[in-house]
Amino acid sequence: MPRFVDRVVIHTRAGSGGNGCASVHREKFKPLGGPDGGNGGRGGSVVFVVDPQVHTLLDFHFRPHVTAASGKQGMGSNRDGAAGADLEVKVPDGTVVLDDNGRLLADLVGAGTRFEAAAGGRGGLGNAALASRARKAPGFALLGEPGQARDLTLELKTVADVGLVGFPSAGKSSLVSVISAAKPKIADYPFTTLVPNLGVVAAGGHSFIVADVPGLIPGASQGRGLGLDFLRHIERCAVLVHVVDCATAEPGRDPISDIDALEAELAAYQPTLQGDAVLDDLAERPRAVVLNKIDVPEARELAEFVEDELAQRGWPVFLVSTVTRENLQPLIFGLWQMVSEYNAARPQAAPRRPVIRPVPVDDSGFDVQADGHGGFVVTGARPERWIGQTNFDNDEAVGYLADRLARLGVEEELLRLGAKPGCAVTIGEMTFDWEPQTPAGGHVAMSGRGTDVRLERSDRVGAAERKAARRQRRERDDD
């Protein structure tokens, strides 16, 4: 069973909005109480929240489907439905959210950072909210909107200050175990480390985090070995450290060629966070070299031989031994100095400014195109949303939809493009036979929908009518 998972595909679905209610107020001695249907509740959203206590994406490996609660239906007596609760999904610090096209949506760093992965649907309006001067007693309500659903890829990129890279069995895990309290698995065979290991290193009154990445081999950036799966964990590192095995007996291996091979893999790797204003490219990150295993006499001689050549590249070089713990303190304080200098020099993340994108004045909000088969296709956020809100089992609701489309200008545009009565018109997932509201076209005034003739005329005699009747009787008596 996998215990460390750093990449998963999850299926998020927000809650749908509750349907509105169509009801009439009923009370003794009030025969014309009017509409009192409440609105539906908003659907719950799926929200990712960074939790420092979570360190892996293992939970999503077994439960990849995440669904929020839907809103409740509205009720009579102007009672709105309850809103669905937002579903907060805990993710590790350093999680990157990608859409199904690989586009970066969010980089979640820092405890409490939130990202709305799927937005809940809006609740439908009840007939009380739909009532107006022209439509006093609506006999229908709007349906709730479906919640947003999309597939997302979560990648965990370890939040560490120093990343240790090197060939398998170079001593990276051993180095982490002696400079921190981490206890990674250590053995004398390649690819012992299968998952990244983190260790907190104390440098005087300061501390920094070191990440041990599984060993790299030539071709790791193209997917060979384990490198492609774990190179993402060094994207956030301020300092990259080459850990070189100076005691290796493999033919064709030496410290210079090992470092050149690793640099070629780092240059070929395309990080997801490339182009971030705060993080430099991997090629521009400061480097350090650790020549390991100098407790072996031949390894010490080789390390001293190549030390000057590596120093000419401008990289600090440390000769260490994890067995005798030689030169570990200079290494720790040297790495802390490099981390602090890099963090002080790089620009701080600017706060995100709200961007307001007003709708253009000449934007009608929809578009009508011929489908090539004698029909037409209407696209646009509002018409498609209105289709989803309409209960097509209610004739009055269908008429209300027709009025909304006519006010938006859809009917006039269809007439302008030569639409004939009975032609097929598609809006969203609904296709219907179009019939103009009036034979004269779209410029004729529409009659109001949802009117109640009982509210227009009444047989009840008011005070003014009684006063006029008494005046007429007095005039007749005088005559």
Swiss-Prot record:
Protein name, per record: GTPase Obg
Family label: Belongs to the TRAFAC class OBG-HflX-like GTPase superfamily. OBG GTPase family.
Residues noted as binding GTP in the record, renumbered to the chain: 166-173, 191-195, 212-215, 292-295, 321-323
InterPro entries with a match to the protein in the record: G_OBG, GTP-bd, GTP-bd_Obg/CgtA, GTP-bd_prot_GTP1/OBG_C_sf, GTP1-OBG_CS, GTP1_OBG_dom, GTP1_OBG_dom_sf, OBG_GTPase
One GO cellular component term: cytoplasm
Names of the cofactor(s): Mg(2+)
Domain annotation OBG-type G: ranges: 160-340
Annotated GO biological process: ribosome biogenesis
GO MF: GTP binding; GTPase activity; magnesium ion binding
Residue span(s) of domain OCT: 358-436
Biological role: An essential GTPase which binds GTP, GDP and possibly (p)ppGpp with moderate affinity, with high nucleotide exchange rates and a fairly low GTP hydrolysis rate. Plays a role in control of the cell cycle, stress response, ribosome biogenesis and in those bacteria that undergo differentiation, in morphogenesis control.
Alphabetized NCBIfam families for the sequence: Obg_CgtA, Obg_CgtA_exten, PRK12296.1, PRK12297.1, PRK12299.1
Annotated segments matching region Disordered: 438-479
Domain of life: Bacteria
Assembly notes: Monomer.
Residues at which Mg(2+) binds: S173, T193
Keywords, alphabetical: Cytoplasm, GTP-binding, Hydrolase, Magnesium, Metal-binding, Nucleotide-binding
Gene encoding the protein: obg
Entries under Pfam families matching the protein: DUF1967, GTP1_OBG, MMR_HSR1
Residues covered by the Obg domain: 2-159
UniProt EC number: 3.6.5.-
